[in-house]
Amino acid sequence: MFKARICGWIGLLPLFMLSLPVQAELRCVANAVDIEQFFSAATAEDKQQVEQAINSSVNLVPFGLSASDWKVHRGDLVVEGNIESNQKLIVLGNLTVKGNISTFSLSNPWVILGNVTATNIVTDSPLLIAGSINASGLVFIDSYYDNPSTIKGSINARGIFINDIIAPVVASSTNSEFMVRASDKNDTENVKKALMIINPDAYYWGLINDEDALKEIFKRSNIRMAGNVCNQMKKEALFRPKPSPELVQELQML
């Protein structure tokens, strides 16, 4: 029976979670463009420009602008292909990536003083974006420790996952087919929408068998789910072409 198969997956979940690392730096793109060539050491004037642009509307203390290892690109930046980085980066303009974006540091922020445009975005790094995020696919934002993420504009994407259990992720608005926040375990409708659209290989636990499991589906996973999302992004296979009739029926019953 369909239910029995689902229950079997759920029963294995605790053991599988224990076998995985609590923290990891996720690298989510294939054939990444070397972006070192576009950046140089940030000066005091660059950091002052960030402070003036934000104009005290965001608390910059968690971003530690006084650190010496910030890299900067002055003006708009357009990259042909996928990018990834674990460094502290500032873009004094718009960032347009004709591919996917992956940031795989748990503590090194990205500060963008314009809009960010890409296909898919998976980030472990704290974000401070003065404009909006525009993605034709998925935006997956993980927050760790005490490092918040702030998007002063909107997040526009086909799907949005936000893991904000440990640290807040703030955006002025969102526009998507689904938007799941890990902190809101009662929002089962958006979880159902996500399960209809996302490739099932992007969530290792299989499906779900009751509403209680549905409410916890992202809260109890976060980084483990992020790892599978990374794998599917590398394969350019984040979204399913069409949900199976069995899945449609299963979700309608919840």
Label the predicted regions:
Residues 1-10:
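Bacterial N-terminal signal peptides that target proteins for export
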Residues 3-4, 20, 99:
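Absolute N-terminal positional cue centered near the fourth residue
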Residues 9-19:
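Bacterial N-terminal signal peptides
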Residues 22-24:
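Boundary at the C-terminal end of the N-terminal hydrophobic targeting segment
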Residues 108:
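Acidic (E/D-rich), amphipathic helical modules within compact regulatory domains
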